[in-house]
């Protein structure tokens, strides 16, 4: 059973991704990362609840050991309100140090606590809430096992020719001015694949990604059919339904390899291609050409 996240849930956040993660909890688009708006320093701490409901439990959980982050995170379980769109299900939220406790009633958009960065985060990942939805009889503590998620909003595919100028940088990433959001705040957008649909995921530094906003073709038996996915003529991988298995490929910026591209859906004015590049640095204003080279071309 798939669960649809309505516009009232998603509209609270500036960005989201179903597939941009290395963790099995996101396999098949069974979890979503929700990114609130950022503060002046590029980070955010507020953690707006995706739903109204009652907090069932909060607990501290282990996180992968990383030299730059704590080895613990926090899990919040919420029973959605009976009048809400996710009534009868269990909502699980990670990456929030809770200011709420079991039995507390929360409204949609009310802060659950303070967003935190644990060992689940790669250094280039912005603060966000990790959200999954389960049937009430499912184990709420296991990392994997949440229900597949569908989007109750449309995401506009933006064509991108692979070029842009650097507008911001960090220690491990650079952001380009293209593709630019044509109407910030009004709708979610994402990078368009050559044959339609919106690309979602870490290419190729995570194992796979997603192709949103395009109905999956079916074979003669009515089952989802596989199809090749490309960007600017560069083959990225093969989609089975909406899930893409990336090829053995390398992303290059001005002809030199980088870790990859971060692909997501956004409605903020700062949307643009995000290069993951801890091994390289770029200057603001620098013109960059991005390509994807398959193993056969290397």
Kindly label every feature range from the protein language model.
Residues 238-298:
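Extended, charged low-complexity segments
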Residues 46-57, 100-115, 285:
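Short, well-structured beta-strand-loop connectors
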Residues 67-71, 108-168, 296:
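Conserved, short, structured surface segments that act as functional micro-motifs
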Residues 132, 144-149, 155-233:
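Anionic-ligand-binding alpha/beta catalytic cores of soluble enzymes and soluble regulatory domains
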Residues 88-109, 275-281:
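Short histidine-centered loop motifs in beta-beta connectors
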Residues 55-97:
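Zn2+-dependent peptidoglycan hydrolase active-site motif and core
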Residues 49-57, 109, 216, 220, ...:
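Generic structural motif
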Residues 12-49, 66, 148-153, 186:
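Short glycine/threonine/proline-enriched tight-turn/helix- or strand-capping micro-motif at secondary-structure
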């Amino acid at each position: 059973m798939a669960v649809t996240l309505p516009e009232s849930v998603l509209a609270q956040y500036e960005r989201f991704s179903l597939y941009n993660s290395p963790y099995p909890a996101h396999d098949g688009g069974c979890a979503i990362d929700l990114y609130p708006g950022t503060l002046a320093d590029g980070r955010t701490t507020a953690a707006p609840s995706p739903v109204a409901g009652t907090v069932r439990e909060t607990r501290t959980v282990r996180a992968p050991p990383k030299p730059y982050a704590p080895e613990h995170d926090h899990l919040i379980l919420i029973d959605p309100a009976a009048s809400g769109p996710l009534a009868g299900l269990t909502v699980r939220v990670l990456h929030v140090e809770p200011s709420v406790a079991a039995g507390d009633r929360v409204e949609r958009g009310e802060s659950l606590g303070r967003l935190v960065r644990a060992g689940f985060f790669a250094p280039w990942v912005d603060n966000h809430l990790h959200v999954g939805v389960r049937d009430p009889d499912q184990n709420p503590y296991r990392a994997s096992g949440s229900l597949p998620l569908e989007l109750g909003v449309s995401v506009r595919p933006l064509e991108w020719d692979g070029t842009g100028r650097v507008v911001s940088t960090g220690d491990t990433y650079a952001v380009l001015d293209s593709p630019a959001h044509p109407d910030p705040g009004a709708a979610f957008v994402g990078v368009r694949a050559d044959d339609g649909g919106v690309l979602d995921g870490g290419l190729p530094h995570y194992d796979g990604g997603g192709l949103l906003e395009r109905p999956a073709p079916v074979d003669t038996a009515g089952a989802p059919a596989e199809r090749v996915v490309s960007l600017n003529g560069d083959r990225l991988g093969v989609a089975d339904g909406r899930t893409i298995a990336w090829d053995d490929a390398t992303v290059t910026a001005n002809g030199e390899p980088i870790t990859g591209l971060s692909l997501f859906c956004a409605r903020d004015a700062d949307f643009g291609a995000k290069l993951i590049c801890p091994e390289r640095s770029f200057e603001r204003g620098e013109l960059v050409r991005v390509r994807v080279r398959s193993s056969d071309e290397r």
